[in-house]
Curated annotation (Swiss-Prot):
Composition bias type Basic and acidic residues, residue spans: 351-361
Organism: Arabidopsis thaliana
Name under which the protein is recorded: PTI1-like tyrosine-protein kinase At3g15890
Entry's family note: Belongs to the protein kinase superfamily. Tyr protein kinase family.
Xref: InterPro entries: CR_Ser/Thr_kinase (IPR052059), Kinase-like_dom_sf (IPR011009), Prot_kinase_dom (IPR000719), Protein_kinase_ATP_BS (IPR017441), Ser-Thr/Tyr_kinase_cat_dom (IPR001245), Tyr_kinase_AS (IPR008266)
Length: 361
């Protein structure tokens, strides 16, 4: 495990760390087999591109979530080492804490805190969706806390980190329904002097991927912002990021939301399970911020720090300023002089997904 030892036992200057040792430990494979009942299917919490996640209980009674890689190769060796390195660096209350890892033989496993409220997607579209546990206050808390986590990765982690896979299933919820962003399997460490084009990853479009990342596979901070914008609209509406209209056509959530914004029909966007409990101005703000993040032109998207500022700002003047953005003006208005300009602006948020045949989450 030269790669793993390299990233966990030494600093980036090659010297052994004397301080700031990670607060997690190495687990034995035997210990994790016992905790998960030999990775029993009944303990399985979910499955992602890198592997499966299992619930477990240690000898002291504490609950854990164990991510077990399903395949192993040189590529996975690098991915695992990168993920451990990332997890060793980050310290933020809204990023999922790692308790340790296991690297024995061909087994590579990461051990996390267990989140009893599972993931955001389980409450929107999964096993808890019928219970409607997410009221408007909880959704706002999730929006702000997840934005703060990603902003931390972009601006305060050293080096900065691109998450690369922001979506509802990677937002876990603690006992207070605070977001715990997880899954840095596609994350990329970015030195401050990095001038590259980002990491290249092969992904299928799941509705959260920005147009430029979908085309090139290259991730960036701005592609994270796009994904977060989609996440905001999913959170507010309760809809999936992609809707299949017929066997050959899918529609991105922005294509449904933007026409309703033109009409200022924000009430039609909100999840019907919320009834009338939402605050109209706050709903409007979250939708507008989501659409600003999801513009197809990366240069026009806000930074995640700016997103946090917009979400926490309660000023009605700020909401009016957002609403006045040309992006939200109806291109079919009667003002012929503005039509061409506004149509160009509004097209920045529309993403055609008619050629995609992908899963919804």
């Amino acid at each position: 495990m030269q790669l793993l030892n390299s990233c966990c036992g030494k600093g980036f200057d090659g010297k052994k760390k004397e301080k700031e040792e990670p607060s997690w430990r190495v687990f034995s494979l035997k210990e994790l087999h016992a905790a998960t009942n030999s990775f029993n299917y009944d303990n399985k919490l979910g499955e992602g591109r890198f592997g499966s996640v299992y619930w477990g209980q240690l000898w002291d009674g504490s609950q854990i979530a164990v991510k077990r890689l399903k395949e192993w190769s040189n590529r996975e060796e690098i991915d695992f080492a990168v993920e451990v390195e990332i997890l060793a660096r980050i310290r933020h209350k809204n990023l999922l804490s790692v308790r340790g890892y296991c690297a024995e033989g061909q087994e590579r496993l990461l051990v996390y805190e267990y989140m009893q409220n599972l993931s955001l997607v389980s409450h929107l579209h999964g096993q808890h969706s019928a219970e409607c546990l997410l009221d408007w206050t909880k959704r706002m808390k999730i929006a702000i806390s997840s934005a703060q986590a990603i902003a931390y990765l972009h601006d305060h982690a050293t080096p900065h980190i691109v998450h690369g896979d922001v979506r509802a299933s990677n937002v876990l919820l603690d006992s207070e329904f605070e977001a715990r962003v997880t899954d840095f399997g596609y994350g990329k460490l970015m030195p401050d002097d990095d001038t590259g084009d980002g990491a290249t990853k092969a992904k299928s479009n799941n509705g959260y991927i920005s147009p430029e990342c979908d085309a090139s596979g290259k991730e960036s901070e701005t592609s994270d912002v796009y994904s977060f914008g989609i996440l905001l609209m999913v959170l507010v509406s309760g809809k999936r990021p992609l809707e299949r209209l017929n066997p050959t056509t899918t529609r991105c959530i922005t294509e449904w939301v933007l026409p309703l914004v033109y009409e200022r029909n924000f009430g039609e966007i909100v999840d019907k399970r919320l009834s009338e409990e939402h605050v109209a101005e706050k709903l409007k703000k979250v939708v507008l911020v989501g659409l600003m993040c999801a513009q197809t032109d990366p240069d026009k998207r806000p930074t995640m720090s700016e997103v946090v500022e917009m979400l926490v700002n309660e000023s009605k003047e700020k909401i009016s300023e957002l609403e006045a953005n040309p992006l939200f003006k109806n291109p079919y208005s009667s003002n012929e002089n503005n039509r061409e300009h506004v149509a160009e602006e509004s097209s920045d948020v529309i993403l055609e997904d008619k050629d995609h045949q992908q899963q919804q989450e």
